[in-house]
């Protein structure tokens, strides 16, 4: 590889919106993320079920579709 053209690869402190902090390697010294393995529903096992039927009924009522 040519010297002087690649970004510096360093330890990166990552902070999640839920408060979880961990370190990875990146070309940035720190990052903030919205979701991580501590708060993502896939990893936590808690799913949020959307009330799709209620939304459809609300739409039909709003536009008088019967």
Swiss-Prot record:
InterPro entries: Ribosomal_bL28/bL31-like_sf, Ribosomal_bL31, Ribosomal_bL31_A, Ribosomal_bL31_sf. GO terms for molecular function: metal ion binding; rRNA binding; structural constituent of ribosome. Binds 1 zinc ion per subunit. Its cofactor is Zn(2+). The keyword rRNA-binding applies. PROSITE patterns: RIBOSOMAL_L31. The keyword Transcription regulation does not apply. One of its GO terms (cellular component) is ribosome. Zn(2+) binds at residues 16, 18, 36, 39. Keywords: Metal-binding, Ribonucleoprotein, Ribosomal protein, RNA-binding, rRNA-binding, Zinc. One of its GO terms (biological process) is translation. Part of the 50S ribosomal subunit. Belongs to the bacterial ribosomal protein bL31 family. Type A subfamily. HAMAP family: Ribosomal_bL31_1. This is Large ribosomal subunit protein bL31.
């Amino acid at each position: 590889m040519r010297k002087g053209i690649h970004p510096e690869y360093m330890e990166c402190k990552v902070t999640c919106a839920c408060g979880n902090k961990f370190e990875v390697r990146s070309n940035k010294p720190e990052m903030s993320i919205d979701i991580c393995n501590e708060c993502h529903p896939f990893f936590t096992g808690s799913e949020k079920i959307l009330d799709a039927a209620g939304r459809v009924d609300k739409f039909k009522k709003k536009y008088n579709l019967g």
